[in-house]
A protein has these predicted regions:
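Conserved active-site segments centered on acidic
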Residues: 2-75, 79
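Structural signal for conserved beta-strand scaffold positions within catalytic alpha/beta enzyme cores
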Residues: 9, 41, 86, 105-108
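Conserved small-residue
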Residues: 14, 58, 84-85, 132
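Short glycine-rich anion-binding loops that position phosphate/pyrophosphate groups of nucleotides
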Residues: 15, 89-92, 111
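Short glycine-/acidic-enriched loop or helix-start segments at secondary-structure transitions
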Residues: 19-21, 51, 92-97, 116
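Alpha-helix boundary/capping residues
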Residues: 61-62, 88, 159
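ATP-dependent NMP and nucleoside kinases share a basic, alpha-helical "lid"
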Residues: 76-103
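Phosphate-binding/catalytic loops
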Residues: 95-161
């Protein structure tokens, strides 16, 4: 068996968008073949806990994410990744950079954690889940193992729909 395709999903707080991205990559990657994809997430300024609306949204889609904690980008420094995906919103926050990945792409999304009213927060998290779900499905449909770095970057950026 070949080594799994390793993906790191980065944002600032690692409490919402990147956690949802990691969860989708882990669960849908496993559904397409055990060991095909390994995903982690981290943040440049990790929050104290995963946003409860992220956990709730994932649970509504059958993904149990209880007990996870945000990680710092420092926690994964030195690890090798085939693809790094930043999901922060360029307009409102600085996206972290992770050196040494084979390819890095940006899938910018507004931070759903900025919504404080419960109905608006649930709506924002659902929209984030839906956007990442479409992108992850499109990414996992690619022949990831056979793409060189330039083709991987181009293809992974193209699924940012």
């Amino acid at each position: 068996m070949t080594a799994p395709f390793r993906v790191l999903v980065l944002c600032t707080g690692n409490s919402a968008r990147s956690q949802i991205g990691e969860a989708l990559l882990q669960t849908r990657g496993a559904a397409r073949g055990a060991g095909r994809v390994t995903a982690l997430s981290a943040g440049s300024r990790p929050a104290p806990r995963v946003n409860p609306y992220a956990v709730e949204t994932l649970a509504a889609h059958g993904i149990q994410w209880d007990g996870r904690t945000p990680k710092s980008i420092d926690d994964v420094a030195g690890e090798a990744f085939d693809l790094v995906i930043t999901v922060c919103d360029n307009a409102h926050e600085a996206c972290p950079y992770f050196p040494g990945a084979r390819a890095q792409v940006h899938w910018g999304l507004p931070d759903p954690a900025e919504e404080t009213e419960p109905a608006a927060a649930r709506h924002a998290f659902a929209a984030t889940f839906d956007a990442l779900s479409r992108r992850v499905d499109a990414l996992l449909a690619l022949p990831l193992e056979s793409l060189d770095a330039a083709a991987l970057r181009t293809a992974a950026q193209a699924v940012h729909i």
